[in-house]
Amino acid sequence: ICFQSLILDMAGNVGTQSLAVTIRVLMDENLTASDKLKLTVKEMKVGFSNGILLGVMAVIFVALYIFLIKGNDIAYSFIVSGCVGFSLLASMVISSLIGTLVPMFFNKMKIDPAVASGPLITTINDLVAVVTYYCMVWLLLINMLHLT
């Protein structure tokens, strides 16, 4: 639970940024399906790149925190921090995808994506981040490694 806010905040930031970029691109009326696909892939690449960078940083700093401050052994520290880092990566990629697809969906339905997308993106990204984090903890730490 200690690192839940880190994952939630970063997923929210990435999703909101993807939302802003997508809404700006959707202002072009001549946007083709190919352009939308390219935008989606580009935003996922950005989310993945940011997720890798921040995930690695999270692994290092969380492991140091658990090892030095909490006094656990180094293997345990890196196992737990790896779970945090991977959850951060996964939630950032998924949030960037959602932040791109939701405004496209609203635009297709003839609803202004700038008005309708914000609260929905925030809620969905929070849910995705929490579910991703707890699923990783459940899969990696509890089921596979029997750490509780």
Predicted regions located by residue number:
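Active-site-proximal inter-transmembrane loops
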Residues: 114-118
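Alpha-helical transmembrane segments and their membrane-interface boundaries
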Residues: 1-97, 101-113, 123, 136-148
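Alpha-helical transmembrane segments that form the membrane-embedded catalytic/substrate-binding core
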Residues: 122-133
